[in-house]
Amino acid sequence: MKLSELLSAYSIETEFSNDFEVHALAELDKATPNDISYIDQVCYLKLLKDSKAGAVFIRKKESSKVPKSMQALIVDNPHLAFAKVSHAFKIPFFKNPQSVNEPKHFEKVTIMPNVVIGEGVEIGENSLIYPGVVIADGVKIGKNCILYPRVILYQNTILEDNVIIHAGSVIGGDGFGYAHTALGEHVKIEHVGIVRIQKNVEIGANTAIDRAVFGETLIKEGVKIDNLVQIGHNCVLGEHSIVVSQVGLSGSTTTGRNVVFGGQVGIGGHLHVGEFTQIGGKSAVGKDLPPNTNFAGAIPAMEIHEWHHFLAHLRTNFRKQQKTSLLQKAKGFFKS
């Protein structure tokens, strides 16, 4: 689709000089000359210098930063413009829904009844697919994988070898991404990325891992994820990390290797947790955490030694207040 056609289709008014063929939406640092990107935060302006994107949605006050090799598509709300045009690149779950009824054959794979498989799916030998599993178009499954009942793999999801996914989990669903109009309406951002799960990963029941806006949501080798976990779009979980039940990772959270998330931990978006760091249950993390540390506490999470001192201080002061209150009551009783 030509740039002019794309902008016209979604009623986006902006000036441009080169009406090139648009192939995709992409991150600035990974874009090609036929891709469009956007900037709605000043911190990303530094990426413009080395970007190969053909065009970028950007506000007028920041447009002078755009290099001559790239077109500045000046709009009031770059995020909203990006959300609108993303609908032109939506990837269907099943491109040809009728094809799911056609028989498909996979060598040395056990597929039980009532499994639904789309077009272009690859499944490695010795994999086991239980009843009720749904596999969308373009999914690639490695060797020795096990998908328990009612697992759903969205389009183009990649599972490497020896991956186990327990019942009811959804891999590759839409991330929670919306742009907002001046009237407060929410415009959905179509996610055109994927989820990649590397080898020897196990995922518990009823867990959701959202696909990337573009690029990959990546679960690295050896990660173990419990039941009822939510992992947002574009997250990266480092090798051999452990994620306990009811953890929620907001979009673009990244971690080093061997990180441990205790139950019900919540992580704000676009944060990094360093390798070998452990976070105690129910902690709320709102900043980057350094490697090789232990954190705990509700809001906000703090280094575990600080948390212990805080609790001790809180307990001591509370007991002092209780004693003071009892003495005051006793004095009042004897005076009466």
Curated annotation (Swiss-Prot):
Keywords: Acyltransferase, Lipid A biosynthesis, Lipid biosynthesis, Lipid metabolism, Repeat, Transferase. It catalyses: a UDP-3-O-[(3R)-3-hydroxyacyl]-alpha-D-glucosamine + a (3R)-hydroxyacyl-[ACP] = a UDP-2-N,3-O-bis[(3R)-3-hydroxyacyl]-alpha-D-glucosamine + holo-[ACP] + H(+). Its EC number is 2.3.1.191. Homotrimer. It comes from Helicobacter pylori (strain J99 / ATCC 700824). InterPro entries: Hexapep (IPR001451), LpxD (IPR007691), Trimer_LpxA-like_sf (IPR011004), UDP_GlcNAc_AcTrfase_non-rep (IPR020573). This is UDP-3-O-acylglucosamine N-acyltransferase. GO terms for molecular function: N-acyltransferase activity. Belongs to the transferase hexapeptide repeat family. LpxD subfamily. NCBIfam families: lipid_A_lpxD, PRK00892.1. The active site is at 233 (proton acceptor). CDD domains: LbH_LpxD (cd03352). Pathway: Bacterial outer membrane biogenesis; LPS lipid A biosynthesis.
